Each structure stands twice: as C-alpha cells, then as structure tokens.
Swiss-Prot record:
This is 3-isopropylmalate dehydratase small subunit. Catalyzes the isomerization between 2-isopropylmalate and 3-isopropylmalate, via the formation of 2-isopropylmaleate. Its EC number is 4.2.1.33. It catalyses: (2R,3S)-3-isopropylmalate = (2S)-2-isopropylmalate. Pfam families: Aconitase_C (PF00694). InterPro entries: 3-IsopropMal_deHydase_ssu, Aconitase/3IPM_dehydase_swvl, AconitaseA/IPMdHydase_ssu_swvl, IPMI_Swivel, LeuD. It comes from Ralstonia nicotianae (strain ATCC BAA-1114 / GMI1000). One of its GO terms (cellular component) is 3-isopropylmalate dehydratase complex. Gene3D superfamilies: Aconitase, domain 4 (3.20.19.10). One of its GO terms (molecular function) is 3-isopropylmalate dehydratase activity. Pathway: Amino-acid biosynthesis; L-leucine biosynthesis; L-leucine from 3-methyl-2-oxobutanoate: step 2/4.
Length: 216
C-alpha cells in the first residue's frame, strides 16, 4: 500500500449529500474477480449519459458535461470534497478502490458511513472529517477559484488552504501509523514473518502429523 505523509492536490467539489457506494461504483462492476480497473467507472451513472457495463470502451461513451469530474477545471483532482454521510449504503470495498484508482488520495466531508470510512484506511485512502462550516467554506473557495489546491499533512493532522488556514482533523494513532508506513492488513502481518515461520517450525516439530496430507 502506498504511504501517505503530505499530499497537495487539486480539489474536486462533489456537492451532494448521502452519496452511497452504488453511486460510487455501480453494482454491475462488482462482477470482476480483480481489485483493479475500477477508476474509469467511478461515479459511472453520473459521469456518463448511458448505462455502463464491464468491458466497455469508456472513450466511446457519451459524457455528462455537467458532472464535476468531467469539467476541465477539475481534471487531475486528487482531493475530493464531499457532503455528509459520504459512502453510505452497502459495504463494498470496491468503492474506495474506485476512488483511489481514479486518482484520489484524500476525501474531506462532514461525516462518513462507518464501514466505508474503515475501508478507506485499509486501502491507503485518507477520509478526513471536518465541521460542516469548514466544509462549506472549502466548497465556496473551491468553486470560486480555478486550480484550488489543498495540502493534507497526515503527520501534523491538518488540512491547509492556499491562504494558510489550517484545519486540524482527528485520526487514531493506529490508522495514522498504518498510512504513514504504507501498511495494509497483509503488510502489518508480514512484519512478523520471521516470528510466524519460527512458530510454524516449532509447532511442526511438536506435532509432525499436522504436516501429513490426508489420503482418501
């Protein structure tokens, strides 16, 4: 998993409340057995005018010019600004996969659905909770100024505006440690690979029959 320390990026404002995971990545794209390739279908029903299906050539599909991610000024955005209860609905992990694979590194909102919030941390995506008034201010600035960027400093736990205003945010010590070091669940486990191997060797020495395969 990619480490997250300090990130400065263009902000895209998604001015909708209660964005659910089916809007983030529609159900038909969950058929894939891979965990890659979801970025092109992020917010599929909002980005395109037709109904998307897995395997389509998205370059030939009609775009919705009014949707924020299709507007030229927000191309290349890596910080998503959202409204309350972002990520509600089903618990599909494909939602943070799609957001990350599109290019987002952080999401700022007044609140998140709990399971989505947890899945973000497990996949290297930083969800940041700010107050509604702070989020309102960021929406106003993002929409008023083309090329509006924010700096997210995970170590200091602040979001910094171009004017130097710093908004502090909370994150648990464990989640912060994992993001700073790029550890997902597997990465955390592999830190103890030597101890695991030593335990398995010791266990098999005491109970060698466990190494035998059953026949029949």
């Amino acid at each position: 998993m990619e480490q997250f320390t300090i990130h400065t990026g263009l902000v895209a404002p998604l001015d909708r409340e209660n964005v659910d995971t089916d809007a983030i990545i529609p159900k038909q794209f969950l058929k894939s057995i891979k965990r890659t390739g979801f970025g092109p279908n992020l917010f599929d029903e909002w980005r395109y005018k037709d109904v998307g299906e897995p395997g389509q050539d998205n370059s030939k599909r009609p775009l919705n010019p009014d949707f924020v991610l299709n507007q030229p000024r927000y191309q290349g955005a890596s910080v998503l600004l959202a409204r309350k209860n972002f990520g509600c609905g089903s618990s599909r992990e494909h939602a943070p996969w799609a957001l990350q694979q599109y290019g987002f590194r952080a999401i700022i909102a007044p609140s998140f659905a709990d399971i989505f919030f947890n899945n973000c941390f497990k996949n290297g995506l930083l969800p940041i909770v700010l107050t509604e008034s702070q989020v309102d201010h960021l929406f106003n600035e993002t929409q008023a100024f083309t090329g509006y960027q924010l700096t997210v400093d995970l170590d200091k736990q602040v979001v910094v505006t171009p004017g130097g205003t710093a908004y502090p945010f909370d994150v648990t010590a464990f989640r912060k440690y994992c993001l700073l070091n790029g550890f997902d669940d597997i990465g955390l486990t592999l830190r103890y690979a030597d101890q695991i191997k030593a335990y398995e060797a010791q266990r098999l020495a005491k109970m060698p029959w466990l190494a035998h395969k059953l026949v029949g």
